[in-house]
Structures are given as C-alpha cells and as structure tokens.
C-alpha cells in the first residue's frame, strides 16, 4: 500500500463523513459542480482544463476559499503545534505526578490500573459504572444480536415484536422491580396521547406538562419505598432491584422517547384527520383501518433507490395502526439505545425496523467499530496518566502554575467529552449491527469548537435534532430566536439535572449564543475583506475561553471550584505572560479549525458547526 493511500485512509478515518452516513455532499453542490465542470470544458475545449471547486464562481459567496494547508502561514502554525501541544501534555502530566506536592490529596481516589503498573483515575461515578460493567454489557450485546437474528430468521416474527419482548426483559434485568415505576410513566403517556388525540393542543400541553413533572417527581421520589405507597406492596421492597438501582438516572433519555412517540402519533393522527374530514375517525373501526392501508404503506416501506432520507423518515406516513402499544413499548425499551441513546424518533425507528438502510454495510460498521475501540483506548491512556478528575474533586491544585491549572480544566472537559462519547458510540455500534442507524452524537472533538452555536449543534447531535423537531420549530424557530433559545436551553438544563447551577449554565449559554449571533451579523458584511479571517480568529479565541469557563462551571467544578481555579490562573505573577500565550495559541488553533471546515466545504460538506 502506497504512502498516499495510507494517508488517504488516515484522513478519512478522522473525517466527519466516516462518522455518519447522513453527512454527504448535498444535491445542489453536486449539480453546481457539474455545471461548472461542463462550462469549463466548453470554454477550454478540453476536459483536461484545470478545475477546482475552490475557485468555482457558480458557488458565489458560499464557495470555500483556496486551500491554505501549504502556505507559509500554516507552516508556522504546524511548528507552533509541535511545540505547544507536547508542552500542554507535559503540564497535565506534572499535575498528576507523584512528585507533585498535592499528590497526597487525591491519591486516595486512584485505583490499581492495568497499563504498565500505573494507577487509574476511576473517581468519576458515571464512567466507573460503565467501566466496571463493560464486560457484562459486551455479553448482553452479543446475546441480544444473536437471539434477534435467530428468532427473526426462523420464526419470521416482525422485528418490533422481538424488540418488544427483548425490551421488557432488558428493562427488568436493568431496573428490577423499579421497572414498574418506569412502565407506570409510560402507560400514562400512552393514555394521554390516545385519550386526548382529538384535541391536539390540549393533548400536547398535557403530555409536555406531565413529562416535565416526571423530572421533578423522580428527583423527589426516586427512592420511595413501595411500602409508602401501600402496605400491601411492602414485599416488593425486598425484590430484585436490578444492576442499576438508580432507575431514575437514565429515565431522562426514556422521557425523550416518550415525548417523541406522543408527538409523532398526534401529528400523524391529525394529518389523517385533515385529509379525510368527512370520516368519523376511530382507530378501532375496521373501515378506518382499511381506509388507511394501501398506497401509503407501499410508499414508505420501499427499499433500494427510493429509501427515505433522514428528514423524510421523521415525518414518514406510517399506518395509524402502527402507533400501537406493542410498537410503543418496543421503541421506548429498544435495548441498544435504551440507556443513553443516541436518540432516534419513533417514526425513524419504525421505518428502519422495516427497511435496512444502505449505509449499514459491513465495511461501514467495521470502520465505526475501529473508532469505538480507539476512543476506549484513548480514554484508558488518559485515565492512567492524567488524574485531573481526582484533582478536581479534591481541588488539589495549590501552587500549581497557571498553565497546569488551565490543563486541569481543559483535560477535565476532554474526559467529560470522552465519558459521554464512548457509551454513545458503543450503543450506536450495537444498534448499527442490529439494523438501526441512529445519528452520531459527537460530530466534532470537544477541542475542535470555537462557536457556541456550532458547539451546540455538534455536541449531543441526536438530542439537538430532537430539540429542533419538538421544541425549536414549534416555538417559531429563527423567527422568534430569543424565546426559542430560552425555551430550548431551559428545557435542556432541567433535563440534564434539576439544579440551579445547571439552569444558570443554560441561561449563560443563551446569553453567549445571542452575543455571538449579534457580533457575527455585525461583521458578516466584511467577510470578503482580507483581515476578516484574522478578526474572527481573535473573537473565536475569546469565545473558546468563555465556553470553557461556562462548561467547567456547569458540569465539572461548580461555582466555588471554578472561582478557585480562575483565581489561581489570574492571580499569579506569571498570569499576563500566560494569558498572552493562551490567546496566541487559541488564535492559531482557530485558524486550523476554520481551514478544516473550508476543506469540508470543498467536498460539498457544510455542517454549520
């Protein structure tokens, strides 16, 4: 294999196209590219004329700039990367070294590791649970995949019916007797949606109100004994509690599926109602069932070239009878995506249960499995050598340099990113092997973000898509940006955790987002000026600092810890030199981020993040 071929494989491995089959050049880009190529051939009388998308006038103002990778400017940036990045890693290692005066403060949180006799930072309770149960989870994954393939092949039962039975067993195994609480919520959602279906606004209000109410009631009553509900239920307190006693911990993801089913059902019901208003619709009447069969099913259950794209699958016209209780339970308890997602809408799940997407090839799945393994290995290496999680929990950074304290914050954000990315990718891989292609949740590395808007789009992408479909668009979308932004981030904050700190995080994010949008609009008129990219780089560097502070406050250190960390960074004799170096380094990093996105545009990819 030639070096060029190897380099091409490496570039593809780290590209966004390798993450998700949904990411591909849009049709309009391909059409414009063909027009430009044909026009160039006509002008030059030869197909060998130089044609590059980067100079394509057909793409007008949206066309990417000429490549900068081989310019002297970027060669200086490469040199800076080879110096700065190792220096950052060295500083992070120094904070975790046994020779560090603060080591004794956090050493008690370290466990015995498996890499070269090193200890491992296993202090994060969420990732510790995942790490401790990884091999059990691997056995469950293999068991579910094998059983489903055997049952579906030999019994010819629909996949959704197997998912229904498997989901019930899986939830009971995970939650034990506490699964009764989850299914009680599910039954109430199903009842509200179907009993109030003729009054869509009332139904939507009732469903959303109850959905938000469940977040609060679960917080208050998560450990409520059955004995407190009724004396006759007291024996249930001694029954099997499952391997996840905190059943409420993962309920938030189930809530998204409960809301998705309810909203999709109401939307489909009223679409049918508006098309044939003369019929008294009752889903229990045989003539109603008959009237809704036929061409609709043939249209949406067509594979091959006519397979529906993601946006079409979200509003696929399923038979109204497909919104039944069995499919409802199969969807909300679908084992591969049950615990933490990624989130897939009910309409999309139902469509993919009947139609295997062409993207689910052995090559794509194998390539994605390699990415999952690489992420796991990277996380293990970091946890064995950089103990910033334990340091943050004990606030053990006294007398560390400003750079070392900044690395504690940065690597904490990276660990938070990886601890979310790994389960999401593992469960998505499980779903892909099972025949369901859920959205990729992490389109960008946490260190490859300079925009609040872009960060929100690329971080937890499936949740972002869910929010756009069920909150952002119904509230008016971009026509009412301030209201929709506060509605979205208030829900996001409450959904994450019912704490005032997280709610403040949501509101701070909104303010940063609105400020970024305003400044971007003010400067967009100058986008063709030679200095525009450099001014944007300065603004993006400042924006990165703000995003780091907000997210460290919201999800890592809280108010007191963030205050202490910032005090240590800024209240130091070397702070001015350090902050100058930080801004220069971030500016260089941002220029590379800009060029990565421009390179994607040259291939017709514009993720807007």
Curated annotation (Swiss-Prot):
Residues 1-18 form the signal peptide. GO terms for cellular component: endoplasmic reticulum; endoplasmic reticulum membrane; membrane. Residues 19-75, 155-169, 222-324, 393-406, 496-502, 555-575 are lumenal. It is found in: Endoplasmic reticulum membrane. It comes from Saccharomyces cerevisiae (strain ATCC 204508 / S288c). Keywords: Endoplasmic reticulum, Membrane, Signal, Symport, Transmembrane, Transmembrane helix, Transport. GO terms for biological process: cellular hyperosmotic salinity response; glycerol transmembrane transport; GPI anchor biosynthetic process. The gene is GUP2. This is Membrane-bound O-acyltransferase GUP2.
């Amino acid at each position: 294999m030639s070096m060029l071929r190897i380099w091409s494989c490496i570039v593809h491995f780290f590209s966004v196209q390798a993450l998700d089959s949904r990411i591909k050049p849009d049709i309009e880009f391909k059409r414009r590219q063909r027009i430009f190529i044909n026009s160039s051939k006509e002008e030059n009388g030869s197909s060998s004329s130089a044609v590059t998308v980067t100079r394509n006038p057909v793409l007008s103002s949206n066309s990417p700039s000429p490549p900068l990778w081989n310019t002297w400017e970027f060669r200086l940036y490469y040199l800076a990367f080879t110096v700065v990045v190792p220096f950052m890693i060295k500083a992070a290692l120094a904070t975790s070294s046994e020779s560090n005066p603060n080591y004794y403060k956090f050493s008690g949180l370290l466990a015995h590791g498996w890499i070269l006799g090193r200890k491992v930072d296993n202090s994060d309770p969420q990732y510790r649970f995942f790490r401790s149960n990884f091999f059990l989870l691997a056995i469950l994954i293999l068991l579910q995949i094998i059983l489903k393939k055997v049952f579906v092949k030999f019994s010819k039962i629909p996949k959704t019916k197997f998912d229904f039975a498997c989901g019930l067993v899986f939830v009971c195994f995970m939650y034990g007797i506490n699964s009764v609480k989850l299914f009680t919520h599910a039954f109430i959602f199903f009842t509200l949606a179907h009993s109030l279906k003729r009054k869509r606004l009332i139904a939507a209000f009732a469903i959303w109100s109850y959905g938000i109410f469940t977040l609060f009631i679960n917080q208050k009553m998560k450990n409520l004994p059955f004995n407190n509900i009724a004396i006759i239920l007291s024996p249930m307190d001694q029954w099997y509690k499952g391997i996840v006693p905190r059943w409420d911990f993962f309920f938030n993801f189930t809530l998204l599926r409960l809301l998705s089913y309810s909203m999709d059902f109401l939307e489909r019901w009223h679409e049918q109602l508006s098309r044939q208003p003369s019929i008294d619709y009752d889903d229990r009447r045989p003539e109603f069932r008959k009237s809704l069969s036929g061409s609709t099913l043939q249209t949406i259950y067509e594979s091959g070239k006519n397979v529906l794209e993601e946006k079409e699958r979200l509003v696929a016209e399923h038979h109204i009878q497909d919104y039944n209780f069995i499919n409802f339970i199969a969807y909300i308890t679908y084992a591969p995506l049950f615990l933490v997602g990624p989130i897939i809408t009910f309409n999309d799940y139902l469509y993919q249960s009947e139609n295997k997407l062409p993207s689910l090839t052995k090559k794509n799945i194998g390539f994605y499995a390699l990415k999952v393994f690489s992420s796991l290995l990277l996380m293990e290496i970091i946890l064995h050598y950089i103990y910033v999680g334990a340091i943050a929990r004990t606030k053990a950074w006294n007398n560390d340099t400003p750079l070392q304290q900044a690395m504690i914050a940065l690597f904490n954000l990276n660990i938070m990113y990886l601890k979310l990315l790994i389960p999401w990718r593992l469960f998505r891989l499980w779903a892909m092997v099972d025949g369901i292609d859920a959205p990729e949740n992490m389109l960008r590395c946490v260190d490859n973000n300079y925009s609040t808007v872009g960060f929100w789009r690329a971080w937890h992408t499936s949740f972002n898509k869910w929010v756009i479909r069920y909150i952002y668009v119904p509230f008016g979308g971009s026509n009412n940006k301030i209201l929709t932004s506060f509605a979205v981030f208030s829900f996001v904050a409450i959904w994450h955790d019912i704490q005032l700190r997280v709610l403040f995080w949501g509101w701070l994010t909104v303010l940063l987002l609105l400020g970024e949008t305003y400044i971007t609009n003010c400067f967009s008129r100058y986008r063709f000026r030679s200095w525009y990219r450099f001014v944007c780089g300065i603004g993006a560097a400042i924006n990165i600092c703000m995003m780091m502070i907000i997210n460290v406050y919201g999800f890592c250190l809280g108010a007191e810890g963030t205050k202490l960390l910032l005090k240590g960074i800024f209240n130091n004799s070397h702070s001015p030199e350090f902050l100058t170096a930080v801004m220069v380094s971030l500016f260089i990093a941002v220029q590379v981020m800009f060029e990565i996105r421009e390179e994607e545009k040259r291939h017709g990819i514009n993720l807007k993040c």
